[in-house]
Regions:
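Conserved binding-pocket/active-site segment within a compact domain
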Residues: 123-206
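An acidic, glycine-rich, mixed-charge low-complexity segment common to nucleic-acid enzymes
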Residues: 2-152
Length: 206
């Protein structure tokens, strides 16, 4: 199992960490030290985790659009890390990635998480942008539009002029939160597709 692999690696390595390795990432501008960005992202993630727990976890948010499109979004503890854009690791060496729900659980427990134990999931530049809108995106009453995604990895986006949450589709026809972008609904909409205007947002139990 994943957990057993982690334990095996720790035993073999003696649990040593690569703390002497500087947190450098290579973006368009060359090597970038993003420790401060990760600290900012973690601070926003902590605030957002509390809101996610209070408003979303274990619930279904039903979005009703003016043209009769209706969709239900299911919110699970394991989805939170994807919205943050952070991968969470067992220790500073980042050789063993923890399950996504572990980041959410540790944030809720007020555990101190070192920036060395997280890394951006995807492009480094996305991390700060996600963090900028993360807490605001925990309020689904602010969703004004639903659009078909121009990104092949995402089915729909639900959002507004500032941010959008990317949605994946489950086998039973419901949706789940897959990503968060700091872009307007029009920027992420697939060219030539209809924009669905939201009429009401309803919170329900699963």
């Amino acid at each position: 199992s994943h957990a057993e692999d982690c334990k095996t690696w720790l035993f073999i390595s003696g649990g040593t960490s690569g703390s002497d390795v500087p947190p450098l990432f290579f973006g368009k501008g060359g090597a970038v030290n993003i420790t401060k960005t990760k600290e900012y992202a973690l601070a926003q993630a902590h605030a957002a985790a509390l809101l996610y727990h209070e408003r979303l976890e274990g619930r279904s948010i039903k979005i009703h659009c003016e043209d009769d499109l209706t969709l239900a979004i299911v919110w699970d503890a394991g989805n939170f890390a994807h919205l943050c854009g952070l991968d969470y690791y067992l220790d500073d060496s980042k050789r063993c990635r923890l399950p996504p729900r572990k980041l959410y659980e540790d944030l809720l427990r007020e555990r101190r998480i070192s920036p060395k134990r997280v890394s951006p999931h995807g492009d480094v530049q996305w991390l700060k942008k996600k963090a900028d809108v993360l807490t605001d995106a925990m309020d689904m009453s602010k969703v004004t539009h639903v659009v078909v995604s121009g990104n092949s990895r995402i089915v729909l986006y639900a959002g507004n002029e500032v941010w959008c949450i990317g949605l994946g589709r489950m086998r039973d026809g419901r949706y789940y939160p897959q990503s968060l972008v700091k872009k307007s609904f029009d920027e992420v909409r697939k060219t030539g597709t209809v924009t669905h205007i939201v009429a009401a947002v309803e919170t329900m139990g699963l």
